[in-house]
Regions:
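Residues lining hydrophobic/aromatic ligand-binding pockets adjacent to catalytic sites
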Residues: 1-157
C-alpha cells in the first residue's frame, strides 16, 4: 500500500515563479495556504496574486485561515520561541473552526497531492511542521525548497 505524501513549502527568499515551479515539479495538485493572514510584503505572495499564479499553472489553491498561526504565535515565532509557538498553535488547533478545516484538509490530502504553504523556508521553524505532526503523522512528508533569491553583496558584480 502506498503511503500518502504531504508536501510543505515556504516562500522566504524565493520568487513566486520559483515556488510555482517547485510545486509543478513535485506534481502538487492543490496548494493549501495555511497563513492566518494571506498577505505578504514579498511580491506575488498575497492571496489573490498567488492564487492566480498557481491556478494558471494548473494547481488548485485553497486558503485555510483557521490553520494559520494567531498573532501571539507569530510574535513567538519572530522571537525564536518555538515552545511558545507550539503552545499557542496547539490551542488554535482545538478551536471548532480549526477542527473543521483540519478534517477538510485531511480529506483533500487523501485524494490529491497537497502542499502546505507558509512563509518560513525551514519547515522545522514553522507551524507547517506542527500541523503535519498533528494531522498527517501517517503520511510521508516532503519539504520543498524553491530556488532561493540571494541578494547581491555590496561591491560585487
Amino acid at each position: 500500500m502506498r503511503v500518502p505524501t504531504i508536501f510543505t513549502i515556504g516562500y522566504e527568499q524565493a520568487t513566486q515563479a520559483a515556488v510555482v515551479s517547485a510545486l509543478r515539479e513535485a506534481g502538487v495538485e492543490v496548494l493549501a495556504d495555511i497563513r492566518y493572514l494571506p498577505l505578504s510584503r514579498r511580491p506575488g505572495f498575497s492571496k489573490s496574486s498567488l492564487r492566480a499564479a498557481v491556478e494558471e499553472a494548473g494547481i488548485g489553491y485553497r486558503h485555510f485561515k483557521q490553520l494559520g498561526t494567531p498573532a501571539d504565535g507569530r510574535a513567538a515565532a519572530r522571537r525564536g520561541d518555538h515552545a511558545e509557538l507550539s503552545r499557542v498553535y496547539a490551542g488554535q488547533l482545538e478551536l471548532p473552526e480549526a477542527l473543521a478545516q483540519m478534517a477538510e484538509l485531511r480529506d483533500l490530502a487523501e485524494h490529491q497531492r497537497v502542499a502546505l504553504l507558509c512563509y518560513e523556508r525551514d519547515a522545522a521553524e514553522c507551524h507547517r511542521s506542527l500541523l503535519f505532526d498533528e494531522l498527517f503523522a501517517d503520511f510521508a512528508r516532503v519539504d520543498l525548497v524553491p530556488n532561493l533569491v540571494v541578494p547581491a553583496q555590496a561591491g560585487t558584480l
